[in-house]
């Protein structure tokens, strides 16, 4: 069969479209994605659509983001004018702005410069859209920051502080009512938000805010929670959510949420809220949520696999940490039975060791004694890198509660000597090494110490001086150049500073340490860690005026090298080196004014008052023997010799 002949040109094109009537039923109906719905391609939750900014609006917020870098306080009138103009631009399109990458950054910055009224106005404009915002990437971040600022406003309202309200403002709702609007909107969907990748973070912040804890972040550091004053209705509402979760969720569901990467954060908040309510209440001491999760007496923890899961799961261990911090003492005994016989294995486990640290902080003397007896068998491994954190916490607990300090200190010393028999004790404990300096072009090697080991040594110096003297002696056995190197290293300098500041430090040790620095004070003073060391030497030389004179003379001789250095100039000012160079006699007088009391005077003044003795009263009558000789008066005062 012959094919139809093809003709060229637009008039005869086969791609010519024809008008076809299509009914509305044939179109695919696009629905709003359901909460928790997963994209089958990206495997991520589908985010609701909140609108987009026009290219001109996006360009505006990109430029504003760069402008806000130079504005750090609201005290400037230009800053206030800029903030007002930003909120005027945002008004009416809040959802589109907070869901934009540039707009969200601008909002996070401008919240720190905004007035309380502006923040409340913005928060109120989101009413009815909180559920959608919590499910978006940028919107959830903005909402977290916004909750932190709302917490500050609530705290001020509760304490009766003056808010920076604006004149002519029409919005009169309190921060309390605004937060409750948000809670009422999210409450029906909490079960779906619990393990949502984005919403779980917002839910955690909201629950802790209701419980009186506000998230605060300074710079790039990790956010921390501070206590604030909140209405009593907030805490009752927070507990009602926890109570509802305990009633409606099965134990298996709670445990599954505990090891979920996102839901675990909310479970931790639930536990905190429940135990804090238990601490406040005088009658109701029940903890139904925690009991269903783990603490019920019906559960045999030795036979319960969930306990092992919580101990060694990266996510679940955080829930167990919160439980260990707050559980009753009777439950700690149950936990001790689980740990007995395997303290060392759990303490060196990369995840379980964090739970063990929380447990040790609450342990009593008998529990610590059992632990130490078990650790004796692994004494050589006590100073392993993986065990240092637990060892530091254990010694810290012994120092705070004043038990087993001698036992543990000797155990650490013997373990270090056994593991490194030919190495100096101080060097062995700090795990000191020399590594190539990445910032140096000549291949210079610098001292590097283990940070946790430094913290352990600091804790070891807080034991009675009779014990810590052995550690100080090992430091002083090093060459002066090595001691100077430790004094200028970021981590180990804290140890040297602590030793110099010890009030009960032996005079011989103090002199030897100061002698090690002789000739290096100027070199030490121009480093960031060393400048603190030289300042602490002022305290260490209170009873050693000759040493103090030698130090200031060495700093004065270095001159501009110290005076105009960023760190050295602070030492120069604290030691008043300029006064020493200009008028040495005045400097000596000023130095003597700071001299501490002599030990003998301290002992005399600390003596108890004399009892059953008659104090001599000064008589107003003239003495009969005004011409008594000096010898007679001295004999009368001191007695017959």
UniProtKB/Swiss-Prot annotation:
PROSITE patterns associated with the record: PUM, PUM_HD
Q: Which residues lie in Basic residues bias regions?
A: 1-14
- Compositional bias annotation for Acidic residues: 20-30
Q: Does the keyword Nucleus apply?
A: yes
Disordered, as annotated region: 1-39
Compartment(s) of residence:
Nucleus, Nucleolus
The molecular function terms of the Gene Ontology recorded here are: RNA binding
- Report which superkingdom the organism of origin falls in: Eukaryota
Task: Describe where the Pumilio repeats fall, as residue ranges on this chain.
Answer: 89-124, 125-160, 185-227, 248-284, 302-337, 338-373, 477-515, 516-553
The cross-references to InterPro entries, in alphabetical order and at most eight, read: ARM-like, ARM-type_fold, NOP9, PUM-HD, Pumilio_RNA-bd_rpt
User: Where is it chiefly localized?
Assistant: nucleus
Instruction: Alphabetically list the UniProt keywords.
Output: Nucleus, Repeat, Ribosome biogenesis, rRNA processing
What GO cellular component entries does it have? 90S preribosome; nucleolus; preribosome, small subunit precursor
One GO term (biological process): endonucleolytic cleavage to generate mature 5'-end of SSU-rRNA from (SSU-rRNA, 5.8S rRNA, LSU-rRNA)
Xref: Pfam families: PUF_NOP9 (PF22493)
Q: Which SUPFAM superfamilies match?
A: ARM repeat (SSF48371)
Q: What does this protein do?
A: RNA-binding nucleolar protein required for pre-rRNA processing. Involved in production of 18S rRNA and assembly of small ribosomal subunit.
Protein family: Belongs to the NOP9 family.
For this entry, the protein name equals Nucleolar protein 9
């Amino acid at each position: 069969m012959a094919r139809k002949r093809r003709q060229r040109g637009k008039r005869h094109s086969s791609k010519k479209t024809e008008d076809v009537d299509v009914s509305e039923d044939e179109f695919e109906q696009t629905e709003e994605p359901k909460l928790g719905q997963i994209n089958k391609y990206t495997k991520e939750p589908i985010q609701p659509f909140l609108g987009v900014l026009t290219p001109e609006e996006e360009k505006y917020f990109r430029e504003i983001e760069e402008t806000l870098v130079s504005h750090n306080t609201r005290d400037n009138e230009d800053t206030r004018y800029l903030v007002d103009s930003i909120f005027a631009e945002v008004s009416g399109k809040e959802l589109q702005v907070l869901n934009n990458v540039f707009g969200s950054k601008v909002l996070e910055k401008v919240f720190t410069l905004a007035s309380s009224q502006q923040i409340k106005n913005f928060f109120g404009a989101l009413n009815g859209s909180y559920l959608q915002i919590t499910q978006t990437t940028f919107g959830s971040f903005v909402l977290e920051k916004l909750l932190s600022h709302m917490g500050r406003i609530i705290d001020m309202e509760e304490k009766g502080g003056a808010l920076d309200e604006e004149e002519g403002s029409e919005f009169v709702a309190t921060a309390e009512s605004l937060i409750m609007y948000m809670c009422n909107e999210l409450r029906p969907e909490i079960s779906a938000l619990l393990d949502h990748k984005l919403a779980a973070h917002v839910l955690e912040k909201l629950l802790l805010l209701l419980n009186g804890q506000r998230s605060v972040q300074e710079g790039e550091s990790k956010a921390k929670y501070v206590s604030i004053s909140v209405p009593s209705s907030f805490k009752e509402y927070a507990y009602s959510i926890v109570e509802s979760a305990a009633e409606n969720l099965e134990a298996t569901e709670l445990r599954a949420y505990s090891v979920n990467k996102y839901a675990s954060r909310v479970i931790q908040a639930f536990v905190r809220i429940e135990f804090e309510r238990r601490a406040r209440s005088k009658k109701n001491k029940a903890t139904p949520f925690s009991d269903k999760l783990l603490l019920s007496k019906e559960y045999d923890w030795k036979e319960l696999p969930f306990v092992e899961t919580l101990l060694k799961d990266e996510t679940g261990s955080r829930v167990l940490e919160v439980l260990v911090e707050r559980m009753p003492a009777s439950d700690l005994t149950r936990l001790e039975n689980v740990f007995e016989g395997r303290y060392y294995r759990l303490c060196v486990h990369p995840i379980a060791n964090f739970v063990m640290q929380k447990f040790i902080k609450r342990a009593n003397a008998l529990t610590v004694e059992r632990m130490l007896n078990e650790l004796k068998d692994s004494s050589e491994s006590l100073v392993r890198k993986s065990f240092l954190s637990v060892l530091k916490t254990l010694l810290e607990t012994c120092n705070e509660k004043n038990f087993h300090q001698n036992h543990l200190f000797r155990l650490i010393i013997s373990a270090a000597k056994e593991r490194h028999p030919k190495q100096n004790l101080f060097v062995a404990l700090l795990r000191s090494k020399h590594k190539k300096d990445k910032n140096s072009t000549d291949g210079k090697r610098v001292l590097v110490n283990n940070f946790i080991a430094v913290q352990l040594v600091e804790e070891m110096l807080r034991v009675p001086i009779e014990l810590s003297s052995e550690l100080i002696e090992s430091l002083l056995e090093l060459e002066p150049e090595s001691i100077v190197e430790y004094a200028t290293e970021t981590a180990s300098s804290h140890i040297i500073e602590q030793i110099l500041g010890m009030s009960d430090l032996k005079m011989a040790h103090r002199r030897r340490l100061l002698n090690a620095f002789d000739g290096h004070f100027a070199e030490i003073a121009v480093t960031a860690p060393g400048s603190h060391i030289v300042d602490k030497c002022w305290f260490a030389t209170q009873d050693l005026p000759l040493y103090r004179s030698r130090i200031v003379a060495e700093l004065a001789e270095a001159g501009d090298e110290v005076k105009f250095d960023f760190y050295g100039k602070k030492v120069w000012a604290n030691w008043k080196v300029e006064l020493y160079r200009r008028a040495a006699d005045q400097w000596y007088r000023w130095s003597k004014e700071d001299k501490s009391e002599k030990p003998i005077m301290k002992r005399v003044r600390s003596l108890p008052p004399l009892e059953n003795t008659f104090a001599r009263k000064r008589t107003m009558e003239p003495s009969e023997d005004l011409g008594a000789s000096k010898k007679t008066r001295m004999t009368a005062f001191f007695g017959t010799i």
